[in-house]
């Protein structure tokens, strides 16, 4: 999702959590994400524990150690299956109104530096950012030639062609509790 890319790029710059939503807002940025390979998934079962308030406690007499009550573990531990995309490669095109942030990001990416290790949400999903280039967007091209995802409002289904839809968060803003989603977008793509 767009929000994942915004968070990933903000982490590269070392921006504090919930501080970058205006930079990547709908009217100040544009992001395009294109898969560069056929996406394959793998299902991996994992045991999970609850992280609700009150379930995680500090261990008495031990600095920095947290524990979950064994009774909570016995009752609440669940096996869940997570689906991961395997060896994925994406092209990300970015336009920012904030020229200073864009230049700083370009400098970080072109030199292979990042403040925080780029990841797609989990430590198992570390990202490697390569082939960083700058280009100028020009009018023209074939508006019918799309091999990626397309916003739902621009989709014209073709009989006999499979099509999938996915609704994802697109925009966020900071609030008293951290952040809230302010807009969603639905994308269509060929499976």
Give residue ranges: language-model regions.
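Glycine/small-residue-rich interface belts in oligomeric ring/scaffold proteins
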Residues: 1-57
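Internal, well-folded beta-alpha domain core
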Residues: 34-191
């Amino acid at each position: 999702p767009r929000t994942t890319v915004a968070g990933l790029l903000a982490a590269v710059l070392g921006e504090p959590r919930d501080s970058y939503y205006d930079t990547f807002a709908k009217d100040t940025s544009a992001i395009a994400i294109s898969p560069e390979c056929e996406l394959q998934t793998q299902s991996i079962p994992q045991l999970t524990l609850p992280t609700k308030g009150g379930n995680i406690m500090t261990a008495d007499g031990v600095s920095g150690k947290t524990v979950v009550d064994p009774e909570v573990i016995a009752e609440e531990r669940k096996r869940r299956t997570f689906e991961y995309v395997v060896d994925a490669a994406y092209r990300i095109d970015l336009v920012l109104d904030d020229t200073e942030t864009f230049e700083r990001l370009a400098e970080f990416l072109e030199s292979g530096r990042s403040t925080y290790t780029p990841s797609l949400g989990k430590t198992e999903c570390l990202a490697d950012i390569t082939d960083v280039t700058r280009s100028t967007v020009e009018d023209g091209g074939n508006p019918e030639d799309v091999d990626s995802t397309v916003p739902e409002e621009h989709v014209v289904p073709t009989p006999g062609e499979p099509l999938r839809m996915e609704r994802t968060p697109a925009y966020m803003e900071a609030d008293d509790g951290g952040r809230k989603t302010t807009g969603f977008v639905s994308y269509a793509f060929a499976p």
